[in-house]
């Protein structure tokens, strides 16, 4: 991922968060599940890191959702794409205004160079799939090394099927869903844009990388079309 790496669809009129909600069925439910699961892991004086945080929506949810029992965690969102920077700045200002006690920071950098340490929770929501394949394992290894014992890595990824017939059926079912919100020309244009950016793994490949990084198991907790959300514990 270069410094010029960016998402053109982040500039859409409806905004990125609404766009992804209309693109991935059940996206809001996924975020709700992640927030609920986070309460089992977030601890005071530890780092809670969301890589590829886009607009910072999940980071803000962590701050609000964990404040009643864990007020002194350090919340970090990491984002590389400049299209999100203005909204991240606005969200950071709002969080500090509404929750002046919160220790929250958005770092505009490449996660491949991030020093994970003292982490009780790391999240990655549809981020690994945009990284060069050669870098994904190293990032997972760094995450594992930076997690405290008992800490969790919660992630969501677009996957591909190992069976081509199933892949075709699920893909067209997914397109049928998207047609409820987007014109066919918009869907095609986005597919062209993402073709050289988004290169998903199979679920078995993801499991294999996690195991090699040190995680003993990864448990899926959310699925829709070819998208999967899962949790791995150190």
Identify the meaning behind each predicted range.
Residues 207, 216-234:
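Core SAM-dependent methyltransferase catalytic element
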Residues 1-15:
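N-terminal, positively charged/glycine-rich alpha-helical extensions of SAM-dependent methyltransferases
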Residues 123:
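A conserved beta-strand element that flanks and buttresses the S-adenosyl-L-methionine
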Residues 137-149:
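A short glycine-rich, Lys/Arg-flanked "PGG" loop and its adjoining helix->strand segment in the class I
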Residues 49, 54-112:
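Class I SAM-dependent methyltransferase SAM/SAH-binding core
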Residues 26-44:
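Conserved alpha-helix/loop element of class I SAM-dependent methyltransferases that forms part
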Residues 158-211:
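C-terminal alpha-helical "lid/dimerization" subdomain adjacent to the S-adenosyl-L-methionine
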Residues 150-158:
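Conserved beta-strand signature within the Rossmann-like core of class I S-adenosyl-L-methionine
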């Amino acid at each position: 991922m270069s410094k010029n790496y960016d998402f053109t669809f982040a500039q859409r009129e409806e905004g990125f968060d609404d766009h992804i909600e209309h693109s991935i069925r059940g996206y809001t439910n996924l975020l709700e599940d992640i927030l609920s699961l986070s309460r089992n892991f977030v601890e005071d004086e530890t780092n809670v890191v969301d890589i590829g945080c886009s607009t910072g929506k999940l980071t803000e949810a962590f701050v609000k959702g964990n404040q009643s029992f864990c007020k002194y965690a350090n919340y970090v969102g990491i984002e590389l794409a400049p299209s999100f920077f203005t909204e991240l700045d606005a969200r950071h200002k709002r969080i500090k205004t509404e929750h002046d006690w919160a220790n929250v920071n958005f770092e505009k950098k490449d996660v491949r160079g991030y020093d994970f340490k003292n982490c009780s929770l790391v999240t990655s929501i549809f981020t690994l799939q945009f990284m060069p394949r050669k870098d994904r394992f190293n990032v997972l290894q760094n995450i594992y090394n930076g997690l405290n014992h008992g800490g969790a890595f919660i992630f969501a990824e677009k996957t591909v099927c190992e069976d081509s017939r199933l892949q075709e059926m699920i893909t067209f079912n997914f397109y049928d869903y998207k047609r409820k919100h987007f014109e066919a020309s918009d869907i095609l244009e986005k597919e062209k844009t993402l073709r050289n950016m988004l290169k998903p793994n199979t679920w078995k490949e993801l499991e294999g990388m996690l195991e090699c990084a040190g995680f003993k198991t990864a448990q899926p907790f959310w699925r829709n079309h070819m998208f999967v959300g899962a949790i791995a514990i150190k």
